[in-house]
Amino acid sequence: KWSENGDTIGFKYADHITAVRHDGYTLVSLANPWRRGSVLHRYALVPRTDSARVAGSLPEGATVVYTPVERSVVFTSPHCFLLGALGADKVVDGECDFGYINLPYVQRGVKAGAIADCGNSMSPSIERIVSLRPQAVLVSPFEGASYGQLDHIGVPLVECADYMETSALGRAEWMRFYGMLIGREREADSLFAVVERNYKETMRLAATSRLRPKVITERVVSGVWYCPGGKSSMGRLIADAGARYAFAADGHSGSLTLAPEKVVAEASDADCWLFIYNGGKAPLPADLLAEYQGYKMLKAFAGGGVYGCGSATGVPYFEEVSFRPDLLLMDFVRIFHPDLGLK
């Protein structure tokens, strides 16, 4: 019978995941980030070579995933990026939201027919997913999430709740779990060690600056300004870069839905304004004002402190930032601390 005894695999920064290695399998528990004290999902990762031996001793209620996963459907671009970074791009047999994925190997694979486009992640093609015979489907959960027909196709759903971590390193550390899934545990541990080292070195560099600029992010969309919560990984990353996030006092780890007037009232004195833009051309000041006249009240708008990243210009921002926060942190330090003379 299953025993609680086993060797705990330490996660240094991630708060919502634990893993215990038992004889013949590894039990991974994902905490529910929306209901404190409850479990989102448990997985028993079983090497195929041990499947017969441990068949009767696995914990009840755990979703069994036979490892290494060699065929998968991946719903999110950050996880497509990670699998590629771990040398496991061949594991991706299907993906969703192809039009938003800025990864050459995925684009080539879909065009060549080696990777299937399974449609919109909110309403994917179940028939196409089933036809791929995946050994796991990597999905992005949300509060109260239901996966409809996906729950009934007999394929393990791996709920990628890493985005609910409250620190950038905590989110990135989930790569170690994904490494366990695909038989790239050593590679994932090595990559995370690089990310951690770079991140900490950059934090120390930021601390030497005399500047502590105030920062806001994002733009108005359909009359709403969506900002990262004060306890989100992005909010924490801005702080780690030696800046003051305008909503740092907020206690949420997800996104804030704010009236534009509230953002302007709270952050009109922000020195830096950062946002992502779609399309290949950066918006001009006139374009921004056509979107929302209130932007002209921002100190950053008037003072040249506006920085945009074009997600459709060959820059894989959405793909990389989750698991390579060290790269984004360095970009932030370059922006926030011109006194350091970084290029």
Predicted regions: what is each one?
Residues 202-292:
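Flexible, glycine-rich surface segments
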Residues 293, 298-325:
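C-terminal regions of proteins
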Residues 26-132, 137-142:
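A short, structured surface patch at a secondary-structure boundary
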Residues 1-80, 187-216, 315, 340-343:
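Bacterial Sec-exported substrate-binding components of ABC uptake systems
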Residues 114, 125, 131, 135-224, ...:
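Extracytoplasmic substrate-binding proteins
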Residues 87-89, 102-112, 151, 235-248:
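Ligand-binding cleft/hinge of the Venus flytrap
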Residues 65-66, 130-131, 151-152, 208-211, ...:
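Extracellular/periplasmic catalytic domains that process cell-envelope and extracellular macromolecules
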Residues 71-74, 91-95, 136-140, 157-160, ...:
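Structural recognition of the beta-strand scaffold that forms the well-ordered cores
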